Amino acid sequence: MLRKINAIWEGDGADGTGFLTAQSGAFNKMPYSFKTRFKNDDGKLGTNPEELIAAALAGCFNMKLSFVLNESNFNPTKLNTDAELIFENGKIFSVNLNLRGEVANISSEKFIELANEAKDNCPISGVL
């Protein structure tokens, strides 16, 4: 599988703006900038690379966990994961996941075991 994103940046670091376009069409010319990286007080839609990394990890983790649960004969009704990315001194320090799930007939211990398996085998986890 090959996935492509096009990123365009115009201008200098502080005042420039950019646009992200996904091959899939999920977003087209989504704006990003230094201002949306750290604050977005103007109410304009925008994102930043760190937010996209957190979203990719949470989404990939949920999908992987769903498959891991299915392989163990559990059917999730809902998996809800928050990803909190810590960005300090110009570097990503960590990404923490907070998971809540609705899965019938599973013990807390088994759910945690399978969630850890999914975390360890999620393709996005492997690059972070």
Each predicted region: which residue ranges?
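Extended beta-strand/beta-hairpin segments
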Residues: M1-A55, N62-L128
